[in-house]
A protein has these predicted regions:
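Conserved Rossmann-fold dehydrogenase catalytic segment
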Residues: 135, 165-176, 198-214, 233-240, ...
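Flexible, small-/acidic-enriched active-site or ligand-binding loops
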Residues: 284, 348, 352-399
Length: 406
């Protein structure tokens, strides 16, 4: 039994941030019911190619994007623009612990599915609203996608090559990181609200905004600005506060060197055949190395090209200096540590026979994550959920289906 197997979550969200939170809760054992539009479902079902292939090598209807954020859930199709559909969602909410939604501010009020409406039928409900900009403020009514929030929220000003270098300019992160982090923060907030409910007996509304999360996750870079008034500049792969902490060329590619303290720098200098660097008045401490970055980095680049990536990694690891290769995803999934940790799993799938999944990183000793159910087909569990949760019989379900509610 999962740690959250006593909970039911009604997931009205689409795309990534909300579904990511729902998947985490589902991985931990919660019964997560994904409510989708009849006929089309979650937008990401069509966000391909690539699509999952069947045994004959033909594309199925399941896009890889959708498959990344929806395992261990049950899918029901309900058209809640119709009164009958609204009634069904309200009845499901009355029997749920959590609702997750990511509609525009006020969007669900028109259907009687906003927090005040559902609180009236279930005062213990934890209701998590995820939007681009939050429920308040001048941007509250605006839609917000990860890419635009990375730009507006300052992250892209920190990523990319520095001005003056070839290819200079702001660059977005290679995955929808703001969405994913919002999903993580939403999960933390939901669990906190559930803990409060267990003590106080009442639920609450959670107002999560992609912009808020993005700003919060600027972390040390935000503090670099707030303590100085100077906006941090793009440094490519370099670190604003630690040197050397970036990529360097090797005889056959590149590697990452992450020197975290002066002792590690001394060890690196010895492996590099330049022990004098550790006592050089320009480089002896991290503060000096940051101040003299422009002098030190070219010297390191001149030294690193004489060994292969594997040689650097082997020798520096032996010396206790953190470093590593730069892997593509094929190399990453074949890395012995990734294999040992079981970070790729396979689950039975109705259309393809099996579907690959990235494993949850959560490792609990007493209530481990269980891979119970592949990302569901559209409406795969409609009849079962309406029967199990609401007690509707086959005739009632068929009537709702024939009237276009399901």
């Amino acid at each position: 039994m999962g740690a959250l197997s006593h909970l039911r979550v009604l997931d009205l969200s689409r795309v990534l941030a909300g579904p990511w939170s729902g998947q985490i809760l589902a991985d931990l054992g919660a019964d997560v019911i994904k409510v989708e539009r009849p006929g089309s479902g979650d937008d990401t079902r069509a966000w391909g190619p690539p699509f999952l292939k069947d045994a004959q090598g033909e594309n199925t209807s399941e896009a890889a994007y959708y498959l990344s954020a929806n395992r261990n859930k049950r899918s029901v199709t309900i058209d809640f623009t119709q009164p009958e559909g609204q009634r069904l969602v309200r009845e499901l909410a009355a029997k749920s612990d959590v609702v997750i939604e990511n509609f525009k501010v006020g969007g669900l009020a028109a259907y009687g599915l906003d927090y005040p409406s559902l609180k009236a039928v279930n005062p213990k409900l934890v209701y998590c609203s995820i939007t681009g900009f939050g429920q308040t403020g001048p941007y509250a009514k605006r839609a917000g996608y990860d890419f635009m929030i990375q730009g507006l929220g300052g992250l892209m000003s920190l990523t990319g090559r520095p001005d003056g270098e070839e290819g200079a300019g702001p660059v977005k992160v290679g995955v929808a990181l703001t969405d994913i982090l919002t999903g993580l923060y939403s999960t933390v907030a939901i669990l906190a609200a559930l803990a409060h409910r267990d003590q106080a007996g009442v639920g609450q509304h959670i107002d999560m905004a992609l912009l808020d999360v993005q700003v919060a996750c600027l972390a040390n870079q935000a503090m670099n600005y707030l303590t100085t008034g100077n906006p941090p500049r793009r440094l490519g792969n370099a670190h604003p506060n630690i040197v050397p902490y970036q990529d360097f060329p090797t005889a056959d590619g590149d590697f990452i060197l992450t020197v975290g303290n002066d002792g590690q720098f001394r060890k690196f200098a010895e492996v590099a055949g330049q022990p004098q660097w550790a006592d050089d008045p320009r480089f002896a401490t991290n503060k000096l190395r940051v101040a003299n970055r422009a002098e030190l980095i070219p010297l390191i680049r001149q030294a690193t090209v004489f060994k292969t990536t594997a040689e650097w990694v082997s020798q520096l690891e032996a010396a206790g200096v953190p470093c590593g290769p730069i892997n593509d995803l094929a190399q990453m999934f074949q890395d012995p540590q990734v294999l040992a940790r079981g970070l790729a799993v396979s689950m039975p799938h109705a259309l393809a026979g099996a579907v690959p999944q990235v494993a949850s990183p959560i490792r609990l000793s007493e209530t481990p994550v269980e891979y119970r159910r592949a990302p569901p087909l559209l409406g795969e569990h409609t009849e079962a959920v309406l029967g199990d949760v609401l007690g509707l019989g086959a005739d009632a379900v068929e009537r709702l289906r024939s009237s276009g509610v399901l």
